Amino acid sequence: MLSVGIPMALNYSITAIGTMILQSAVNVFGSSVVAAFTAASKVSNIATQTMPTLGTAMATYCGQNLGAGKHDRIFRGMKDAFYLCFFAAGAAALLCCLAGPTMVGWFIHNPSEQTLHAAMQYLHIASIFMLPLAWIFVYRNGLQGLDRGLVPMLSGVLELFSRYAVILIATKPFGYVGVCSADAAAWLTTGILLIVTYMTVSYTHLTLPTT
């Protein structure tokens, strides 16, 4: 239990640090942009609620089937979860893009045109990268369920580094759009790392299903 719980706790802590760094970068653009970014982040969190739920389910699923020695079920379950990621990401992206202006209004009363534009800039960029975000939840939790907690923990460090690097590199030439891209870059790099790690673990440490 500790081998799963400790990496999860560290990941949440690292993610919180990354969020604070990102918020600090946004603060320099003024109160209206800060309000827009905060509201857009809340909208994104609402739109992606299926992803952490799916991830938690996969952690339990992989752990139970690993303990039972049913590796074929792990393969099938993770394959199905991979395809579910497309559905979850597509639904989240559509919700952010189509209902984004209305949902931003839930958190900002009568937002100005500038504020709404800034919020939608973040949501449009985030929507493009919802798929790797879904991968993070599924494969990070799946690997932890398979008692492979090191890489999921290190993936949090990569996520933090990616955000910080994009903020340093892209903020000056691209301004607020560069800051909005920090989450997207973190999701993409971390999602790819976790998929590659799962593929390596599944084909080197698990018994391949017979056909």
Residues of each region from the PLM?
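Hydrophobic faces of transmembrane alpha-helices in multi-pass small-molecule transporters and flippases
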Residues: M1-I21, I46, T50, L54, ...
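Transmembrane alpha-helical segments of integral membrane proteins
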Residues: R163-I169
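Short runs within selected transmembrane alpha-helices of multi-pass transporters and secretion channels
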Residues: G55, A126-G145, V151-R163, V179-I195
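Helix-terminus/linker motif at the lipid-water interface of multi-pass membrane proteins
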Residues: S13-K42, I46, Q64, T102-S112, ...
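Short alpha-helical transmembrane segments in multi-pass integral membrane proteins
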Residues: M1-I6, C62-F129, A170-L206
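Small-residue-rich hydrophobic transmembrane alpha-helices
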Residues: A36-L94, L98-G100, L133-S155
